[in-house]
Amino acid sequence: MQLNYFPINIEFDKFQIFTEPFSEERLAELRNLHNTTHSFFRNGDTIFISNKDAHENVTIGKIAEQSTYDNANITASLIKHLFFRTFKDRFPNHTPVDFYPFRFFSGQQKDDIIHNILPDNLKNRIAYKKLIEVQLRLTEINGNKQFGFLINIKRNWIFDKTCAELNAENYNLIGVEVLYAETLPGLSNILAPNEEFVGEITEITGTKAKVSTNKGEEEYELKELFIRKTKFNIGNYLTFFTSQQKSDEILRIIENKREDIYNPKKLYAEITNIAKALFTDKGTPILFQNKDGFCFTVNATPLTVLNTIELKTPTFIFDPAATKTINTYPDNGLNNFGPYDSSIFDIKSPNILCICNKTVRGNFTQFLSNLKDGLPQSKYFQKGLQKKYDLHNVAFDVKEVQTNTLSEYLKAIREYDDNKPHLAIIEIPESFKSHSDQSNPYYQIKAKLLSLEIPVQFVTTRIVNNHSEYSLNSIALQIYAKLGGTPWVLPTQRSVDRELVIGIGHSWLRKNQYAGAESNRVVGITTFLSSDGQYLLGDKVKDVAFENYFEELLKSLKQSIQHLSFEQGWSDGDTVRLIFHIFKPIKNVEFDVISQLIKDIAQYKIKFAFVTISNKHPIMLFDTNQQGVTSYGNNIPKGEFIPNRASNVFLDAETCIVQMLGANELKTSKHGMSKPIQIKIRTPQGNYNNCELNNMLFYDLSYIAQQIFSFTYLSWRSFLPAEEPATMKYSNLISKLLGKM
């Protein structure tokens, strides 16, 4: 396997660099006087100075010795500045979009996929181009500490006609979303102008436009504004300038080429070609250097890696005694053994409220019958909900609505009998997806049923009219879980320690996308899980405002430990391990608060770890030996160059990446590149000294990676393994849904 990571070769452990004491005034003065030849950056109370192009005799500041890896932040800043200045020297016609992550557009005509179809007077003014991104990382793979560059490729619109030009062409700008472009002082022709999404144009007078922003109406020069680079906005302009037919043709080319440009095999080839151009000249490595003796080269071939550990697919358990197990697919276990909690599940005869539009009652009742009793000729759903999940009698109470309006649905819900239903199944039209969150009946119906403590299973009219064994099988699984059942659990990893796993997710609620928009982050604290994946303390599921999440977490944690210690018979002196799956890096002050809480629960020895799980990172894994797999009825291979599920690399003692979707898990060849998730154990940052805390932290990355991998098999929304563990999947869903309701 190979990473999109190109190692940097530094042949010294220490280096010398000039420094001065930091002040804002002095830093500004130095940049003003010497910015053409020197780089200046701050670290703490010190200004660090790199002489790239001035004479060696020009000295500024006093010389200081630094360790290449012990002072990694300083080394990293020096590498970034030298890379930037060398790039500008070698490619003077390229203006980078950003300093860091370093981004620039390809200058090759072949990388603009709409160039040949555009009219001549729009060529190079409008484009859909390859955007190249370079980021720096310090890794310690297999004990080898080194820096390296990560290369990624995206495709972005270019539209460099100002609103002044569009206005002169009589293009209607009223109501159009616009960006304000500002060239930062001293960076003309060095960096592209900074663009900020400010709002919509409401009025134009002469050379100025009034823009509705989050600060109210503000006035801008038309020459400083550009339309927001979205498919919708650019499509509208192309229709105006050419024709609807031509605009549709241009946009269709982009859509048709999407599978090709994101093909993993081609992506790998493009990344390696970019590395050769950036890091070599006619096959010879480029020497990135300054006049002070700091220098490095970069490998033009990506780093080859092997799996750090073997991640194992868990065994699925279907009875409390762990005598009924299966090692392949949990669906096979359910068909053979029934659900894990069959002997103790107390809702054996669920009453289910079913609501549909009167025009689809025939198909809806057929759907319910097939859901309950199964499809006799099918492979996966012969038994149906009732027999597969060992239920005695599933009773449906079907009610009709005249129209698909909120009032009609709420009326049907209010009419349910005194015998409160255990669950509701509600048919809704596909058109609900086009509603805004605020007016969407889906969220309002869900909120009403939530207030009545009735779980709900929505099904779209399309599925009701055209359901298969696959959709019925998944819906039955979801229904059993929503009734409170446990379809299967995982084996606990043998340990004398007690363990709880807590998921904390989040979602952003923004008024709009304009700069300065009012936004709220909603945090969802999911049900606590035991190490075998059983959900504990269901009443603790909630969402809270971001500023209150840590206080709520501590309260839930304290109550949960008290409750579970009694329920599970913990003894004084037991070691209890708390694994938090959390959406954000934790602050040092939050480590302090947790450690204080732990000291307050003195009867147990508590160890804990905060772990972030994310797919928003720049790292990719390639397997050049993977030639792809074909699906039944489709000869086009999918997943070329994508590693198998469970492939993994430990980037350092705290960070690893794990491939969750391999070639076999992809649905089609159109999926494109599948990124691994990044798992990172969070530790206090900076000059932090708390010896007591160090003894409380749990550092076993191998254990945590295996547990997270196993928990991806615990999403009861589907029988297929998920990309993220159930802890994060459900906590993110909770915060998203409750935030919208």
Each PLM stretch: what is its role?
Residues 1-196, 213-217, 383-384, 399-404, ...:
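Long, contiguous domain-sized segments
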